[in-house]
Amino acid sequence: MRGLPGAFLGSFKTSYGYLSQRLYGVLTEEKYDGRLYPSHIPTSTVQKAILAVGSGVAALKNPYRHDMVAVLGETTGHQTLIKLRDRMRNDPEGSTILLERPRIRLSTLDLSNMSALPDGTLGREYLRFLEENRVTPDTRAEVKFVDNEELAYVMQRYREVHDLLHTLLGMPTNMLGEVAVKWFEAAQTGLPMCILGAALGPLRLSVSRLQLLGQSLGLWALRNGGRARCVLSIYYERRWEQTLDELRHELNIEEPPVSLIASIKNSSSKS
């Protein structure tokens, strides 16, 4: 039985690779017009189920397989994406985002202007987060398996604001910080992949970090994720000069206690 997950994962990788290649091949035919957006790969219900199960197993084995986490999110979150889309439609700023479809990429960021902003502003602290953690928004995969163009954008927006949530919540990119953000996202969005990550992420934490999560950090993340304004409805690109304190207040997000932030950063330095 111990060999079953590995065997299944190997079979999934082969099937997933073939399916992706086959579908991409179909998409390159000039006569094919089934794409709803440039990166779209149309799939049947059965194909989505196969992708969901296989990507779920792969993500469980290695939560850092962002490609598998992405596939899992796209193949399991349709109903939740509808609810998130509706929340955005009912928000003036969110509806503007749905209309204008901004993207958060290096090509759309004015890095020189952001670096000149005062400490404590969203733009300066977001850039600092990217630099200190050596991450870039360009690593966020394009949505492929969502069979609705507008919902695909909602999923893409969710991915591209993830690092902004790290900035807003003051969370590092170590496992504890990622789990805390995932708990916030689970309460905020209800996406199945976020709930799964929130449930299984703690299994990879040490006893001391698990204790910190259970006693204070997790409760803080769940409370704030559940009561905050929809984080997808914020036009962050127009708010770089706004201070984090002001934006947190507007979103109804509590800043984590100073002692808690210190504990998390200390945990990160030991990773």
Curated annotation (Swiss-Prot):
Q: Where in the cell is it found?
A: Mitochondrion inner membrane
This protein's cofactor list reads:
Zn(2+)
Which principal EC class is assigned to this enzyme?
lyase
Annotated membrane topology is:
Peripheral membrane protein
According to its UniProt entry, the protein's GO biological process terms are: ubiquinone biosynthetic process
Task: Name the protein family.
Answer: Belongs to the COQ4 family.
Q: Please explain the role this protein plays, according to its UniProt record.
A: Lyase that catalyzes the C1-decarboxylation of 4-hydroxy-3-methoxy-5-(all-trans-polyprenyl)benzoic acid into 2-methoxy-6-(all-trans-polyprenyl)phenol during ubiquinone biosynthesis.
- Protein name stated in the entry: Ubiquinone biosynthesis protein COQ4 homolog, mitochondrial
